[in-house]
Amino acid sequence: MTDNRGVKIIRPKAYVVSILFSFTIIRGIVLSYTNFGPNAESISENMTSQKLVILNFDDGRESQFLNAKPVLDKYGFKATFYIVCNYVENKPGFMDWKQIRELYDEGNDIGSHSMNHAHLSKLSKKEIKFEVGESKKCLEDHGIRVTSFAFPFNEGSNSKEVINSVSKYYDLARTAGSPVTYLHCDGWKNQSSQKDCRTFTKNEDLTFANRYSIRGWSHDMSRIANAYTDDDLLKRFINVVNTQTEYNKGEAIKAIPIVIYHRAGDNAPNYNTDIALFKREMSYLHDNNFQVITMRDLGYEQQGDYLYVKSTEDLSATGG
């Protein structure tokens, strides 16, 4: 089975034998035999020499396509773009379907950001189902495979009712509030004592961290909250993407930073990243050998209840 990049989709517990014939000699013949059951974590172990980062763009603004995409393309980076379905071709300043499809066809990941960017925690059960489920159908009706959801306003990941709806339609969901996400959901010592990513406790209580509350760092909120200049924000960005080195020391990949952007160089006063700054940030990632991946490059191991990074043969792009 393949996705829009034409690469193999690897599922947990499936034994895969892959033979790649290459006439470049550089790659030669690669034989991979991988068990994604109990040994799924070994995929992350094989990537310890890599510094990883996931780039997210929320809302589907046209400036992301017009201004950020050329910078991503320069370095071969791919990102996850979260689309508000009813904004497409209905609100000025947002992408149209042709632009979204171009992103997808070029190997970027497209996720759902609801139908109307609603406050999910304030909605009825029926309204939640519409915002969450119909938005996936909307994207699929345009030929786009969707696996993840991003919470509008970062609200709803602590609601059992919202999570019950999200989990019916998506493999993963993302909120904000942390420089890194911990693949075993065990790094938030002040908020939780959990050691895995199960969604509910034995008492059916919603856990603090799980695959439907993957945490990212909001680049724009960080600027607003701290009144950062571009130079300040660049320093903070560098600090955030390198935070993983505290946890990924010669063992399995345990933590990955997820950077969340909104507007991209459209001169708005809030939630905007100047393109000059964005270029400096992407240049930093490239020059320091970061591997840029997307949300769909994360898998979930059901038996062990943890997230993992899929095989390097299936990642979106290294940007090397």
Tell me what each language-model feature is:
Residues 21-25:
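Hydrophobic core
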Residues 50, 107, 209-214, 254-256:
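Sequence-level motif detector for i,i+2 pairs with an aromatic at +2
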Residues 37-109, 116-119, 127, 131-156, ...:
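Active-site beta->alpha N-cap acidic-glycine motif
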Residues 218-293:
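Catalytic grooves of carbohydrate-active enzymes
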Residues 64-67, 72, 91, 119-236:
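Catalytic domains of cell-wall/extracellular-matrix polysaccharide-remodeling enzymes
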Residues 2-20:
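N-terminal Sec-pathway targeting helices
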Residues 69-76, 92-112, 166-167, 201-209, ...:
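Acidic (Asp/Glu)-rich catalytic clusters
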